[in-house]
Swiss-Prot record:
The keyword Transmembrane helix appears for this protein: yes
Subcellular localization, as worded in the UniProt entry: Cell membrane
GO annotation, cellular component aspect: plasma membrane
Lipid bilayer topology: Multi-pass membrane protein
Residues annotated as transmembrane: 1-21, 51-71, 75-95, 118-138, 142-162, 181-201
InterPro entries tied to this protein: Multi_antbiot-R_MarC
Main localisation: membrane
This protein's record includes keyword Transmembrane helix: yes
Keywords assigned: Cell membrane, Membrane, Transmembrane, Transmembrane helix
Protein name per Swiss-Prot or TrEMBL: UPF0056 membrane protein AF_2111
Pfam family, one: MarC
Family stated for the protein in its record: Belongs to the UPF0056 (MarC) family.
Length: 213
């Protein structure tokens, strides 16, 4: 593959993961969960959450294909299942995010910095079923070592943006406002729904081909 092909693959991987992980849409959630803490504790929560989220995605994308092979599950089946979950998630965001409100309520009951960093921030907010599905699919279908590295790099870039959004959360929210961040989240949710439908149809098409239909 030439350089243009690699760049195109990297851009596709990055945009897919960015839309699914949704840094702008999840920023108000992070602010709501951490506003009762001091700046020092917010920094700790942010660092731990982004590192843990990236490690979860990295480990699952690298090992996910092998685990699926062990259980005899195809990537096409993962696409179908992941696409359905992604579509449900996108509808939830478009309708107001009832599950995210539940995450808020549970996190607000905890005073443990480590607990909040792991749940709900790292998992499932920043590394949910959709991100894991996309990571495994992208990594498994990467044709060579360079493409696999580009998938990992695209994930690292997205989580770097997540971290930067936490650091500059105050000016970002001042610029966009809470309603602006909500609008951005809902716009991304439309693209998320499109990705979900594409995953499902790709998976179904691959299933039909494998059955010679």
């Amino acid at each position: 593959m030439d350089i243009a092909g690699y760049l195109s693959f990297f851009f596709a991987s990055f945009t897919t993961l960015f839309i699914i992980i949704d840094p702008p849409g999840n920023l108000p959630i992070f602010i709501a969960l951490t506003e009762r803490f001091s700046d020092e504790y917010r920094e700790k929560i942010s660092k731990r959450a982004t590192i843990i989220a990236f490690l979860i995605l990295f480990i699952t994308m690298v090992t996910g294909g092998k685990i699926l092979d062990y259980f005899g599950v195809s990537i096409s089946s993962l696409k179908i299942a992941g696409g359905i979950l992604l579509f449900i998630s996108s509808v939830d965001i478009l309708l107001g995010g009832t599950r995210r409100e539940a995450y808020k309520r549970r996190a607000e009951e905890s005073i443990d910095v480590d607990s909040i960093a792991v749940f709900p921030l790292a998992l499932p907010l920043y590394t949910g079923p959709g991100a894991i599905t996309a990571g495994i699919v992208l990594y498994s279908q990467a044709g060579d070592v360079v493409m696999k590295l580009l998938v990992v790099l695209s994930a690292a870039l997205v989580y770097s943006i997540v971290r930067l959004s936490h650091i500059y959360s105050a000016p970002i929210i001042r610029l966009l406002g809470r309603s602006g961040a909500d609008i951005a989240a809902r716009i991304l949710a439309i693209f998320l729904a499109a990705i979900a439908v594409e995953f499902v149809f790709d998976g179904l098409a691959e299933k039909l081909v494998s059955m010679d239909l």
